Amino acid sequence: MIMYERNGKLFITFNGTMNDPADIILSKTDKINVSIGDKTISGNIPKVISSAEDFTTALTDSDTTSIVLENNISIADQIKIEKDLRIDLGGHIISLNNSTVDTPLRIDSGNVVLSNGTIDATFANETVVPVCCFGGTLELNNLTVYAKTSKESCVFCGWGGIVNIISGVYENLAKDKYFWAGGSPLVLNISNDNVGTINCFGGIFIGKDPALGDDRLGGTFVAEGYKSEKITYQGKKAFMVIKK
């Protein structure tokens, strides 16, 4: 079942996609809890996002707490999130390859869930970090995140932010060693002076082993009760986080 809001109406489809005719159309509401036959529908209603402009508008709309992409979008300017928000990429791609800033997708506060799609910075400037958390809590689930930088990482956290990685694939495609300290290109990184927290409860990491923690502060990015195992993923050396 898929629920989404478009043009002031709530659309519900039980077996199709957002491009198929809806089974039920209701007046717009931000939350729903109804029973129809043997089906119960409840929860926040995601707003459909078709462009970077729609994305920006959703961030300033206090009533919008859940969004879903209906196509690939490209982000050039910074998207700054400062509220509770669920972001479902719907299997689509957010491209950061035309980014004009180093932190194009940045969480500053709130509880944010980012899931079900791809964040691609493969051809961005090498100072671009695809996902940044500078405050609040960010959950990453069923994502593929690509960076290609010898200076930065796929995910960066600082200023008291917390990143919880549940699942997904995180790959730094850089061919050179890490610019600042040598070794494998970074996949995860935290600020040295304004520390954040990264907890890995799952995921596949192609680049530096998350068990080795930060390049300067040490520690580990693997959550308590979990471990990192060396694997081969699509012909590449990788590390997979699993329960002990």
Question: What kind of feature is each model-predicted range?
Answer:
Residues 18-29:
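Surface-exposed, short loops/turns at beta-strand junctions within beta-sandwich domains
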Residues 72, 87-92, 99, 110, ...:
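Solvent-exposed loop/turn tips at the surfaces of repeat/solenoid architectures
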Residues 10-14, 43, 96, 236-244:
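Generic recognition of long tandem-repeat/solenoid scaffolds
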Residues 74-86, 95-115, 121-138, 150-152, ...:
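Extracellular beta-strand-rich solenoid/capping regions of secreted or surface-exposed proteins
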Residues 6, 45-70:
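Acidic Gly/Asp/Thr-rich repetitive segments characteristic of extracellular carbohydrate-active
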Residues 35-43:
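Short, exposed coil/turn segments at beta-strand boundaries within extracellular/luminal domains
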Residues 181-244:
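Leucine-rich solenoid repeat scaffolds
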